[in-house]
């Protein structure tokens, strides 16, 4: 639930974009910049939140993150200037949600599960994206008629409601409740340490080692494109884009909800395929198809049938890139550094999402249309696929095991 609320808070900026524009008269680029900053901090805080979980504990880090999210969004109810929105929904909520991001799932998995770690982490990752998209129609319903305060209040109360549950119901270690990690042999064996950075300096050191390898930059760059084409563009601007074509916010949010449902299927299937096929080939297919679909979207008739087909197709590919990216990180950076390196690769994802969240709004403000933004993003998807194909042909890389 904490992961869901954190991701849901970040996706809420897409719901309130048009209502804020109508209520305050702020331009689309200004509103988009705040969404971009929040997305960027959401990713950047992750590696350092892992260090905080090691020093003060998972529960305290969660409480701090949820408290900051609740306070910053609640305070925004009284905002009157763009910088109020930037501070509350960009800076403060970005930091707070970053402390309760995917790194939390990884920390809990490593501390509480000795076996089935991949399955549990996959479920947490998929359900976070799926859940956030599923609840968007309700938030869009609250924003009918240009209302934005009911949406903000709902998100704030959701963050606040979780605080007592975390404070009283989240043990720090399995031993605190007289048990051991799931699947652990020997009931008194201590839990294994988290695979994230224990200190900020260790996170930086892992980044320095990884940056010397071309594979890091390839994965960082392609994950940049992943964020650019999902959270940043579709997640932030699809509702507004559909509004330009006369589609009501609730119906547009329903498309995101449908994507969320099929994301669960696509991500699970991607994990199964990653265990059996070369992850580089999978990434080539995922990025190539995603890019072509984004290029095609602006030229559809925006009827119910065409948008439904797009939502299903795009939902299957929403975060299907995560399992093969993690697999390549494990193969190239080793068991010790791979989780930390993936945390930095995920920063690239959020950088791409931030670039699209701001850039698409700027393009819409300058041209009056989202068409160039979707075509450009689609082009980046195709380029990412071609770079992966070039890497596969020039570099043999570690052997990929096949059953």
Predicted regions and their residues:
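Helix-loop-helix hairpin linking two adjacent transmembrane segments in secondary transporters
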Residues: 124-175
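Helix-to-loop junctions at the C-terminal end of transmembrane segments
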Residues: 45-58, 267-278, 364-365
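Extracytoplasmic gate region of multi-pass secondary transporters
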Residues: 13-17, 208-267
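Intracellular juxtamembrane helix-capping segments at the cytosolic ends
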Residues: 20, 99-113, 320-333
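Interfacial helix-cap and linker-helix signal at transmembrane-aqueous boundaries
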Residues: 20-21, 52-53, 134, 138-146, ...
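Hydrophobic core of transmembrane alpha-helices in multi-pass small-molecule transporters
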Residues: 4, 72, 84-99, 224-225, ...
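Cytoplasmic helix-loop-helix junction between adjacent transmembrane helices
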Residues: 89-126
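C-terminal ends and interior cores of transmembrane alpha-helices
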Residues: 67-80, 289-302
